UniProtKB/Swiss-Prot annotation:
One MF annotation (Gene Ontology) recorded for this entry: thiazole synthase activity
Xref: Gene3D superfamilies: Aldolase class I
Native organism: Chromobacterium violaceum (strain ATCC 12472 / DSM 30191 / JCM 1249 / CCUG 213 / NBRC 12614 / NCIMB 9131 / NCTC 9757 / MK)
Subunit-level organization: Homotetramer. Forms heterodimers with either ThiH or ThiS.
Family to which this protein belongs: Belongs to the ThiG family.
Subcellular location: Cytoplasm
Binding positions for 1-deoxy-D-xylulose 5-phosphate per the UniProt entry: 162, 188-189, 210-211
Taxonomic path: Bacteria, Pseudomonadati, Pseudomonadota, Betaproteobacteria, Neisseriales
Annotated catalytic residues: 101 (schiff-base intermediate with dxp)
Protein name, entry field: Thiazole synthase
GO cellular component terms given for this protein: cytoplasm
Keywords: Cytoplasm, Schiff base, Thiamine biosynthesis, Transferase
Catalytic activity: [ThiS sulfur-carrier protein]-C-terminal-Gly-aminoethanethioate + 2-iminoacetate + 1-deoxy-D-xylulose 5-phosphate = [ThiS sulfur-carrier protein]-C-terminal Gly-Gly + 2-[(2R,5Z)-2-carboxy-4-methylthiazol-5(2H)-ylidene]ethyl phosphate + 2 H2O + H(+)
Pathway linked to the protein: Cofactor biosynthesis; thiamine diphosphate biosynthesis
Amino acid sequence: MDDKLVIAGREYGSRLLVGTGKYKDFEQTAAALDVSGTEIVTAAIRRVNLGQNANEPNLLDFLPKNRYNLLPNTAGCYSAEDAIRTLRLARELLDDHRFVKLEVLGDPNNLYPNVRETLKAAEVLVAEGFDVLVYTSDDPIVARELEQIGCCAIMPLASLIGSGMGILNPWNLQLIIEQSKVPVIVDAGVGTASDAAIAMELGCDGVLMNTAIAAARDPVRMAHAMKLAVEAGRAAYLAGRMPKRFYSAVPSSPSEGVISSVKS
């Protein structure tokens, strides 16, 4: 089945995007990415060495260049200015790489997005030619404004970053999905495989996760589980679920031609 995720004009066979933080080491990171089947790998410029620290292990040494599209992100930024500066640095480090994830946080205790600063940063970055995938709240009005600015993917949270609480407001996600003409990728809050499957069944174009895999007892096995969940959820969405019924059950077996126990 030819069902590709398309972001900024590039096609991807996998709809699972995976982060690189919180793993035991880069070897475990690489193993989890491998079994996840992901093609888009995100890394926090402020926390992961991508070449800015010459004396430390470099994540890029563990990632095959021809397999993954790197998605530098601005995790840890609390203002538009910080986020813009961070992604300009990423562009320098990565030879004019412009495929980026914008996130501007509002509170260090809950990591909820600051949508005002996010909108400000998005305007500048899009004007500078970046392909911006943007982390935001599940507010459909904000999502529409980010799309109008020119962001190439909208990434609403399912619940708070790192919470593992799953999808708390499927109705808002549905509104964003229905109005958007760019991919909608759930970002933050996924805790286990069923959360990923539900996101895909709702009609999301993809799911991004990090802690759900890295904080599992067996991250590599969980990465494989997430691969299967995203694929199953997408297939179920395309297949179309049966309608829900209340007190009007229809038997799965036909009633015609059955053997009757009534004596004539």
